[in-house]
Amino acid sequence: MPRRAASPTPSENEVDIAGALFNNDSDFEDNSSKHHTKKGAVTNSGLDLDFNDLLGNGDDGLPSFNGEGDDDEAFIASLTRSSQRKSSNIQGKSVKKGGGFQAMGLNAHLLRAITRKGFSVPTPIQRKAIPLILERKDVVGMARTGSGKTAAFVIPMIERLKGHSPRVGSRALIMSPSRELALQTLKVVKELGRGTDLKTVLLVGGDSLEEQFGMMASNPDIIIATPGRFLHLKVEMNLSLASIKYVVFDEADRLFEMGFATELTEILHALPPSRQTLLFSATLPSSLVEFARAGLQEPSLVRLDAETKVSPDLESAFFAVKGGEKEGALLHLLHDVIKVPLGPPEGTKEESDELQARKRKREYRPNPKEKPTEYSTIIFTATKHHVEYIANLLKLAGFAVSYVYGSLDQTARLIQVDNFRRGRTHILVVTDVAARGIDMPALANVINYDFPSQPKIFVHRVGRTARAGQRGWAYGLVRQSDVPYLLDLQLFLGRKLIIGHDQKNPSFAADVVVGTLKRDGVDVNIEWVEKALKESADLKALKGVAAKAEKLYMKTRNSASSQSAKRAREVTQSRGWTQLHPLFGEEAAEAQAARDDLLSRINRFKPQETIFELGPKGKSSRNKAAEVVRNMRSRFKERKTTNDEDDEDVDMEDAEGKPDGEETNAFEDFEDEEEEGEAEEAEEAEAKEDPYADDSDSEMEVTVSSSMHTKKKGGPVNFQDPEIFMSYTPRTTSLAEEKAYGVHSGGYSGNSFVEAARDATMDLTNDESAKNFGLPTKSKMRWDKRHSKYVAVANDEDGSKGAKMIRGESGVKIAASFKSGRFDRWRKDNRLGKLPTIGETEKSQLIRNFGAQPGQPRYKHKMEKAPKDADKFRDDYHVRKKRVAEAKEKRIGKYKDGEGSKRELKTATDIRKARAVAEKKREKNARPAKRQKR
């Protein structure tokens, strides 16, 4: 009987039962092809059919037919269940509920790389963003630090590009604001791109331009670059970006700030309009107006963790310090709070370059040192001068320190970060260059030595710790001038402010807790710092430079909100501002309070007698000076201050209101009454003047910056009626949060709507020396005090400041050094003709010569030739003579054995070779050997 044809109408789940009924073309099937399982299920044609359920076996194992004719339905149901069980296993792993990477339709190589990377379940940002990106939509993604944003745009990029294209032209561009972030992105791309032949290049400042010329000539698929160096290569090589299909702006809010305005304007102008654009950052505003220049087309906004902002596993503590005590407070924090051990970490040995060269290359494995420890600490400072000063101070104190800042040499930056990652140092001192996107695996503590001027900078700084479920601590040193920024941060985070011991057992993960450090620990370290400054002239010079840099930093940093500045006075004048931090416990707080009370009593002590009245008492010991002082005291009464009068009033009230035997503390009772009075007045004012009392507490929690102004007697009356006035600022949204998330409004200077509207005017005529309505025209020149001459104001606005500039393709001014002709010289030196353009087939010669991936060995010639001898009859005689002298000094080429080209003493090998050469010459000339004379 021939096999029956498959049914043309598939079942609901597209399961063909004919394949299960007839496995072979013959009716006689060998029983050996069936594999019996333990429970009676027979595996046939790759499907597991449970015949016990199918036949309805009873407890005795015998089939029980019910005679109702539903055997076919039971068979089909069993077949469907087995098919579903088989399809649920992909790549050997079951699909997680809610959708895993397997459910996103990724290819097998990429799934294998994701598994090797250690990802099992996608994070929320990956689950939301990857499907949208695979649909080729523009996406703006925001999630807190450490949530897997890099993999969220790398995975769909690899899925879309799939493999290397022989057609010339890069297809993906990833822009990063810093070199370290670009290096980390390259690492993720290489790990997730295993199994593909995609070519990736890294273009950052500090590396050789010639090597990067070769990388770009080898036709890479993916470019990871910083804006400055990429624009330099684009202008120098006259690159075309028409083939770019996938553009990612990592840490987009930092990229679109004014620092990269010129570079991004030129790059965005060269990108094709049909590209897919992605923006990712941990701090993004809800409005996309500020990213209009990115050319987004109907973007999808994925904004997660906007309420949490920082990791829930992060605990924070803020310490009130004085300006001159920051160094001592930092040392006290490291010695007594974090308890960082002195000297290099245990088990780390410095390997020599020779041992590292002989070291066999192996596959990278996570270093056990690259795990968060209780000692690994990163310290953020304001400028690079602070980095150098603090790093040298900590090294002098005995700590193992690494340091990184923006202008540090690229190789030095890599070495310093690698030492910290591998556990060779416990402390890393950095500027904000390391605040964004860099994954520091061995990091448990963050110290804000200089308090951040923007709340979103704080979010990026503390995001270096408490990642991947690990606990972490963030410490901050707060001076009196930093209190407004602390209050802005408190409004942005939406947390409760606890000062001193206002609340018992505060939550360091959910509140903003402020207090002081232990006085005795800080004083000891301050004395040590003063001694070190006296003994080390270099350290003293570094401190002077850091002080000058701090003055400039204070002038240029963003200003805090006016409401926070007003609240700062109340906060610093409160009693809790000088209390010990709750982190040290109640016993230490009581001891500190007793110590402060004793010191305050000693400070307020005034002797009853003057120095003129000292001496033996009695009639026999009369002193004219003492008599004069006594007469003056009896004639003039002591003037009482307002504080003394208040204290007396409080003492009188307490004496009247309490029984005789009870002790009183006038100072504490006075402060308690004052606080109660202020609280009652604040409640009454809030009840009278709050027009939004019906709104929820969560919505009004952080609207302090937009509160109504209180009416003052004799002042101008506010014309705004809260019932009918419609403001341009939203009522229920957090203004503090939106201002902090803003790209150009991270600070509070110049970001009001009125100022922006005033600057948005359009002038149609500007022929005369003045504008309409008598407004003066902005001067085009200004006086430069340093050079004592007038300079153009336009140079200050575009950043040129008198330097040579050229116009780019978009019309903006760029540095003339971007077009220096180095690429033409490089092409001439390598004997390369015209390079292939976009769309042409790549040349195999370029791939062989310059196609090595970053990190792979490049084969270069190492032969060194000595220059030719100087010729007196040539014009370049003196130049050649100088080059020959340099070659002799460096022992290059034929001068490698010394001043002359020959050794003074010949070895046996040299003598044997010389005899062989002489014998060859004799045979060639066919001359008989000379006879020796007798």
UniProtKB/Swiss-Prot annotation:
Biased composition (Acidic residues): 644-654, 662-700
Principal localisation: nucleus
Molecular function terms, GO-annotated: ATP binding; ATP hydrolysis activity; RNA binding; RNA helicase activity
One GO CC term on file: nucleolus
Motif DEAD box per record, residues: 250-253
Catalyzed chemical reaction(s): ATP + H2O = ADP + phosphate + H(+)
Any coiled-coil regions, as ranges: none
A GO BP annotation: rRNA processing
Family: Belongs to the DEAD box helicase family. DDX54/DBP10 subfamily.
Name of this protein: ATP-dependent RNA helicase dbp-10
Species of the source: Neurospora crassa (strain ATCC 24698 / 74-OR23-1A / CBS 708.71 / DSM 1257 / FGSC 987)
Gene: dbp-10
